[in-house]
Amino acid sequence: MATAAMLCAARALRPRSWIPGTCQAQVRHTHQRASLLSFWELIPMRAEPLRKKKKVDPRKDQAAKDRLKKRIRKLERASQELVPIEDFITPVRFLDKSRQRPQEEHSFEESERRALLLKRWALYKQQEHEMERDAIRAMLEAQQEALEQLKLESTELYAEAIKRDTSLFPFEKEGPHYTPPVPNYQAPEGRYNDITKVYTQVEFKR
């Protein structure tokens, strides 16, 4: 049984031979996708269970609505001063659309070289994507074959093998980082000068 499992695992990890010159179907945006062997975090995994709705007393609900209506009437009677929203006011110096840095002009040879480099990179990522996909498919087939052989040997071991592993979650992973860490980096203390203007709302009584 152990020999059969080792043979299946070795066959799964065997690299797929790629013959140069074969026709490769193009996959759009393959070079921008994550690796198939990486851990994909889905939206339902980041969700939380629904909270149980609490029973609301109708009298408390009606009292809260009455207080809100009273507050609205009080605000309607008093004419309040409008506070300017500075976050939506664009400074005049940012409205100048003149470009400060001149655009760099590339020669025809440089443009062709960059286009060819991008195509080669896309082809490389496509081949890497296909190799990872085939490796995953082979590992799944080998796992299924090993489980079938284990089921023939012992049903108890098969039940233990397909049991859910509770130690896998919560899953923690660090990286990959876009840039390497800076050695001996001293983080700033976080001091800043708050220049936010504070407005006082004045109520006028009639």
Curated annotation (Swiss-Prot):
The keyword Protein biosynthesis does not apply. Transmembrane segments: none annotated. Residues 170-190 are annotated as: Disordered. GO terms for cellular component: mitochondrial large ribosomal subunit; mitochondrial ribosome; mitochondrion. The keyword Ribonucleoprotein applies. Its main location: mitochondrion. Residues 1-46 form a transit peptide. Signal peptide: none annotated. It is found in: Mitochondrion. Keywords: Mitochondrion, Ribonucleoprotein, Ribosomal protein, Transit peptide. It holds the Pfam family MRP-L28. Belongs to the mitochondrion-specific ribosomal protein mL40 family. Component of the mitochondrial ribosome large subunit (39S) which comprises a 16S rRNA and about 50 distinct proteins. PANTHER family: 39S RIBOSOMAL PROTEIN L40, MITOCHONDRIAL (PTHR13359), LARGE RIBOSOMAL SUBUNIT PROTEIN ML40 (PTHR13359:SF2). This is Large ribosomal subunit protein mL40.
